[in-house]
């Protein structure tokens, strides 16, 4: 089911395209179908990819489609949103490792075409400039997949006083470190900094697809997509994207159900 939520914001009408899903499995299926359609439309497309728990189900669905002969990743190129600073790419909690484990190693993608920030580059300014050049070289993603943090962050663009344009070196907030602690043995093992594509880089994507599930994301959904556009709710900037789709389950939409 597709519902359109239209709201006024300052000068004009902003329309957020929302696909309502029953649960996480349904979110994953619907998101995978959108990505598969993009690959069929343009076999050499550039996919912007995300990590964390939200897209795992989507990746499983894509792998199943590949194994069933429905998808060919051989020409696909990818740009990942972010990477922890200080974790080598073979560390089991690095996002490079995550992508290999959850997608790349299970499909016929050329991993030379898979781009992820280098978390081991000590030259923060140099790494940010390098990754900006990668993103700009592609002209942005054809389709950017995103998750949404409980505090409204996209990538590692945390709540702040102004939107950041390009790739940046960020200090993670305590709430994000707390949320990521479950992936590490103890809290002090969680990286405190990361490289992340900036808001401007994300907005360069031709299409943006955000997946969201669970009641823990309900407030962020309400704040980001039914509230004012402000850097304190980083995901709210997506209201201004010309081709943005939110795929969310009933729990994630629970605080805005009466608005749909």
What name fits each language-model region?
Residues 2-15:
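Short, Lys/Arg-enriched N-terminal segments with co-localized hydrophobic residues
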Residues 4, 40, 44, 61, ...:
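A residue-level detector for conformationally permissive "hinge/kink" positions
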Residues 14-130, 134-137:
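N-terminal active-site beta-alpha-beta segment that forms phosphate/nucleotide-binding
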Residues 19, 87-93, 97-260:
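Conserved phosphate- and dinucleotide-binding cores of soluble alpha/beta proteins
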